[in-house]
UniProtKB/Swiss-Prot annotation:
Assigned protein family: Belongs to the PsbK family.
Propeptide: 1-11
UniProt superkingdom: Eukaryota
HAMAP family membership: PSII_PsbK
Membrane topology classification: Single-pass membrane protein
GO cellular component: a single term: chloroplast thylakoid membrane
Entries under InterPro entries matching the protein: PSII_PsbK (IPR003687), PSII_PsbK_sf (IPR037270)
Localisation per UniProt entry: Plastid, Chloroplast thylakoid membrane
Entry keywords, A to Z: Chloroplast, Membrane, Photosynthesis, Photosystem II, Plastid, Reaction center, Thylakoid, Transmembrane, Transmembrane helix
Species annotation: Lepocinclis buetschlii
Purpose: One of the components of the core complex of photosystem II (PSII). PSII is a light-driven water:plastoquinone oxidoreductase that uses light energy to abstract electrons from H(2)O, generating O(2) and a proton gradient subsequently used for ATP formation. It consists of a core antenna complex that captures photons, and an electron transfer chain that converts photonic excitation into a charge separation.
Subunit-level organization: PSII is composed of 1 copy each of membrane proteins PsbA, PsbB, PsbC, PsbD, PsbE, PsbF, PsbH, PsbI, PsbJ, PsbK, PsbL, PsbM, PsbT, PsbX, PsbY, PsbZ, Psb30/Ycf12, at least 3 peripheral proteins of the oxygen-evolving complex and a large number of cofactors. It forms dimeric complexes.
Name recorded for this polypeptide: Photosystem II reaction center protein K
Amino acid sequence: MFLFNLEQSIGLLPEAYLPFDPLVDVLPIIPLLFLLLAFVWQAAVKFR
C-alpha cells in the first residue's frame, strides 16, 4: 500500500502557473453553477 499526500496524488501545477493556483481550485465548481442556474431558470418560468 502506497501512502501519498494530496499534492502528490493530484499533481502540482508547473511553477509558471502557480499564480493561477487559486483559480484552478475554483474551476471545477463552474459546471455545478450552470446546473443550479438551470433550476433557478425553470423556477422562474414555473417549470413549463
